[in-house]
Regions:
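Anchoring transmembrane alpha helix of integral membrane proteins
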Residues: 1-47, 53-56
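Signature of multi-pass transmembrane helix bundles
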Residues: 5-13, 20, 32-35, 66-73, ...
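Juxtamembrane helix-boundary/capping and inter-helix hinge elements in multi-pass membrane proteins
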Residues: 50-59, 94-95, 161-167, 175-178, ...
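Membrane-interface alpha-helices at helix entry/exit sites of multi-pass transporters
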Residues: 59-66, 182-186, 281-296, 325-327, ...
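Helix-loop-helix junctions within the multi-pass membrane cores of secondary transporters/permeases
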Residues: 257-339, 393
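Transmembrane alpha-helical segments and their short flanking loops
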Residues: 309-399
């Protein structure tokens, strides 16, 4: 990250910015394309797997219903918090309309917004969610809602049919997800090169424009404040209200979990330690821990959802895109849904953000603005993700 900034300033100061534009920036473009490439496969298989995993709810109906309800409620609040904060602070509203259009073209000359060409009818948004051709829908990131619709159908069908009839297909889905996650791992190994190129290009493209760097600082501050509020105010206060647990004891018990989550940036990697810690330090039963926490590592990503909402609206503000009420609701719906489909591994949330942005017509290339500072924010949102899991597990067990 620092190297990209340094190289950008060096070439800028020596009046050789064309070197960055012609030879370095394309590597950043390749990185963005790789993220777009893997978005649709990840969304489909992750949602199918996440929904099909809920077949256990038939056996644990009371526990399952309570757990899912709490997960959805906290995720909805996290998304609403992120959308509300970024709409109030408006960190991306730093340019005039002409400047926003200019910078949008700088980031991508190929970007075409999904601006309606004719007056839309009230039911058009619902009609467009249903694809008439699966393959054409899969070939365009802007049709992500159609992919989600198909994934929901497949996932629900698996739940209704039961594991006996669908075990072979579920095995294929699990294997496919493993392959996709490995591909994401490959892409993330290329991330240092991509981020280096994007930041070097960012310095050249926005040279002399302190407003952009001020906007990025405000964006990062908005994300951090929202995430800290969730982890250290929202969850502990609710826990105190509903269980009478001591907030200090709770935070002390989960601190080692948060530390590991911050270090690994992976909810899945933290899961075994989380299960052990909540049983030993919080007194949660093995039955509750073994059901609620693995499910949470799959379907509960409050930190990620809050972050995605902030990113989408921030980039829309940077580009001067005014979202309609329907688009705001789409962002709300998709970010909540994305918490089911985001894999608990480093970098997966960025790929899912591509899905949300594509669905409301925001140029995915705008991610280039925030990827350079994403790593520390990824570590922090993983802390919130696992904290949300421990909160729900404690609440379910005590109630």
């Amino acid at each position: 990250m620092i190297a990209g900034l340094v190289v950008g300033f060096i070439f800028l100061s020596t009046d050789n910015s064309s070197v960055v534009t012609n030879w370095i920036k394309p590597w950043g473009t390749i990185f963005i394309r790789l993220l777009k490439l893997i978005a649709i496969p990840l969304v489909f298989v992750s949602l199918v797997k996440g929904i099909s995993a809920m077949t256990d709810l038939k056996r644990l109906s009371t526990l399952g219903l309570k757990t899912i309800s709490l997960y959805l409620a906290t995720t909805f609040f996290a998304v609403s918090l992120g959308m509300g904060a970024v709409s109030l602070v408006r960190p991306g509203s730093v340019f005039s309309k002409s400047e926003s259009e200019f910078y949008k073209q700088k980031l991508s000359s190929e970007t075409v917004l999904n601006v309606p060409q004719k007056e839309r009818q009230p039911m058009d948004y619902i009609v467009e969610m249903v694809p008439d051709n699966l393959f054409s829908a899969a070939g365009d990131n802007s049709n992500m809602l159609q992919i989600i619709f198909v994934a929901l159908l497949v996932g629900v069908a698996i739940v209704v049919l039961g594991t006996e009839k669908t075990s072979a297909f579920v095995s294929v889905i699990n294997a496919t997800e493993a392959i996709i996650l490995k591909i994401i791992d490959f892409i993330m190994q290329f991330a240092p090169v991509g981020v280096f190129a994007l930041l070097a290009a960012l310095v050249v493209d926005f040279s002399g424009d302190s407003a952009m760097f001020s906007a990025l600082g405000m964006y990062a501050a908005t994300v951090v404040v929202c995430l800290l509020f969730l982890a250290y105010v929202f969850y502990p206060v609710l826990l105190k209200i509903f269980t009478r647990n001591n907030i200090g004891d709770y935070l002390k018990a989960i601190f080692p979990i948060q530390l590991l989550a911050f270090s690994t940036s992976s909810s899945s990697a933290t899961l075994p330690f989380t299960m052990e810690q909540v049983q030993q330090k919080l007194g949660i039963s093995e039955e509750t821990a073994s059901f609620v926490l693995p499910l949470g590592a799959t379907v509960n990503m409050d930190g990620t959802s809050c972050y995605q909402a902030i990113v989408v609206l921030f980039i829309a503000q940077i580009f001067g895109i005014e979202l309609t009420i329907a688009q705001y609701l789409t962002v709300l719906f998709l970010t909540v849904l994305a918490s089911i489909g985001t894999a608990g591994v480093p970098g997966a949330s960025v790929v899912m953000t591509v899905m949300v942005m594509s669905s409301v017509g925001i140029p995915v290339e705008g991610l280039a603005l925030i990827l350079g500072i994403d790593r520390p924010l990824d570590m922090l949102r993983t802390v919130v993700n696992v904290t949300g899991d421990t909160f729900v597990a404690t609440l379910v067990d005590k109630k």
